[in-house]
Amino acid sequence: MSGNTYGKLFTVTTAGESHGPALVAIVDGCPPGLELTLEDLQRDLDRRKPGTSRHTTQRQEPDEVEILSGVFEGKTTGCSIGLLIRNTDQKSKDYSAIKDLFRPAHADYSYHHKYGIRDYRGGGRSSARETAMRVAAGAIAKKYLASQGIVIRGYMSQLGPIEIPFKTWDSVENNAFFSPDPDKVAELEAYMDQLRRDQDSVGAKITVVAEGVMPGLGEPIFDRLDAELAHALMSINAVKGVEIGAGFACVAQRGTEHRDELTPQGFLSNNAGGILGGISSGQPIVAHLALKPTSSITTPGRSIDIDGNPVDVITKGRHDPCVGIRATPIAEAMMAIVLMDHLLRHRGQNADVRVSTPVLGQL
């Protein structure tokens, strides 16, 4: 009812606010017997956590996850997995001056109209702080999917006006931007340093790829795999657009260019992003997501207070000048949660389906 749960067979429910005591999650539907440790979850949380470079928020949260249930002697039991991350570095006083004001482009105004009450400290439930639990839950899904030969990885493909070509996965984990091109890192750092001096923010584009996905995942018509991915990725804070495969570029393509022709040796292209008719084709699943510039900046912005009076708002506190810098692990997590759910759903209905047609890769 309140939109805090995702999934049908593999479900993730989260709770918690930016300046509350903790974030929690319940992950249900994970098959029993999966070897799972704190390190499996912490690895991705460390990739997302704040304060890891001068280009992100300086809020210092260790994001140390606790497993409360559903794991015994290092293996999942099949029962619900309870997760907890304690908040340790809140500075709620930073927001006392704006508790009766609406920050431009934030959820303050819309939350106020929906609920009649809102947690003004750091955005409360609408804060990207909430995504830490998505990453923890997604790490469980990634671990299981990896046991089935499915690998999910992401990278930053654009920061502001700077496009980042894909060169190598080896570069992605070796810089603060998740850049696949090591030669672009110095340019990205210089751009962010100038942005900070300008007291401004910028958007970004993230690409996330799933390899090893078997054909057949997806539930037409309303639960198409691409529709579910778009739903999940659009639910990430600050995401304003999602593309699958060629995405909006298909508008300028001709049919002879866009269609992914098949040969006995494999597909000749992947404009569909690994999904045909809402069902996985066996090719890599490719999604791109656009994140808006951070709305919390120190440059004054026009707004109103709760009585409708005009005000200028200056947002204090510690904020990411580009939320996209830490979004890659979040995008990976949401794609993993979707694929995990659909893998279990496919198994439940179609486990006995056998076809003689070979599974094609991409040339």
From Swiss-Prot:
Bound cofactor: record note: Reduced FMN (FMNH(2)).
GO biological process: amino acid biosynthetic process; aromatic amino acid family biosynthetic process; chorismate biosynthetic process
Residues annotated to bind FMN: 125-127, 237-238, 277, 292-296, 318
One of the Pfam families matching this protein, by short name: Chorismate_synt
Biological pathway: Metabolic intermediate biosynthesis; chorismate biosynthesis; chorismate from D-erythrose 4-phosphate and phosphoenolpyruvate: step 7/7
Catalytic reaction annotation: 5-O-(1-carboxyvinyl)-3-phosphoshikimate = chorismate + phosphate
Enzyme Commission identifier(s): 4.2.3.5
PROSITE patterns cross-referenced by the UniProt entry: CHORISMATE_SYNTHASE_1, CHORISMATE_SYNTHASE_2, CHORISMATE_SYNTHASE_3
Top-rank EC class of the record's enzyme: lyase
Chain positions covered by the region annotation Disordered: 44-63
Alphabetical UniProt keywords: Amino-acid biosynthesis, Aromatic amino acid biosynthesis, FAD, Flavoprotein, FMN, Lyase, NADP
GO cellular component annotations of the record: cytosol
Superkingdom of origin organism: Bacteria
Gene Ontology MF terms in the entry: chorismate synthase activity; FMN binding
Gene3D superfamilies per record: Chorismate synthase AroC (3.60.150.10)
List of residues binding NADP(+): 48, 54
Cofactor (UniProt): FMNH2
Subunit structure: Homotetramer.
Function of the protein: This reaction introduces a second double bond into the aromatic ring system.
Homology family: Belongs to the chorismate synthase family.
Protein name listed in UniProt: Chorismate synthase
Organism of this sequence: Pseudomonas fluorescens (strain ATCC BAA-477 / NRRL B-23932 / Pf-5)
Lineage of origin: Bacteria, Pseudomonadati, Pseudomonadota, Gammaproteobacteria, Pseudomonadales
